[in-house]
Amino acid sequence: MRVIVCTLIAAAVLVSGPIARGQGKARTLVAVWAHADDEGPVAPVLARYAREGVQVHMIIVTDGAQGAANTSVARGPEIARLRVEEARCAARALGVQPSILLGFPDGALGHYNADPALLYRVTQRVHEEIQRLRPDAVITWGPDGGYGHADHRMVSSIVTQLARAGAPGVPPQVFYSFLPAEGIRAMYPTRGVPPFVVPRAELLTVQVPFTDADLNAGRRSFECHKTQVSQEAIDRVIPAMRDTWNGQAPLSPMVPEAPAKDLFR
């Protein structure tokens, strides 16, 4: 993906009770992405949950072989290899579990609708991993895919389909990440904001507090994705995250609910 790092957005983490006190079974949060750098908008949230004792996993659906936004390396196997290392680096920076890499072709997921067999295969693989992890909550892209990216939109659709169908091991607690207009401008200062990609404010009912330490962990994770984002862009994005959210990152729940600050209600 062409870096979806920007004004981070996030999920909530008031992991009080058993997790914070180390009692009982730790809760599990799974983030499902198309590409290795898609965690950017919720990186501080993932860092905070991990810091508070939640088992945080990232499922990366594609091999990332077509993403060469910030490198002279040709698209293909070498980029894919580099992005595996970048995914590992980002997971370490956030303090989450090692990334789960499914290896589907980058840039191709949007075409899977035309082939029911391929669509079933990728849906089955995503379901297998979520079912194995049995999360209490899931984060993924919203239906807009952040800025309309077809791979992002397909991953969002798959996760939503599984949750709505009550697939075994998939909770209804699904939360959508998005790219705020300020983040898109910080990331791509020469481009405009695509139409119809930023959700209405009233849909962002989950406001997740994060600390400066969590934001710094997010910065370190962004810096891992050297083939995707420049240091100059990161230096614009991190202040945009901090200033836009003022310590609370918004997410949109799949199932509309009253305002909340916890993904595990």
Describe these PLM feature segments.
Residues 5-15:
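Bacterial N-terminal signal peptides
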Residues 20-133, 161-168:
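Active-site rim/loop-helix segments in enzyme catalytic domains that contact anionic ligands
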Residues 14, 66, 183-184:
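Flexible loop/turn segments at secondary-structure boundaries
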Residues 2-6, 19-29, 116-265:
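Metal-dependent de-N-acetylase/amidase catalytic core
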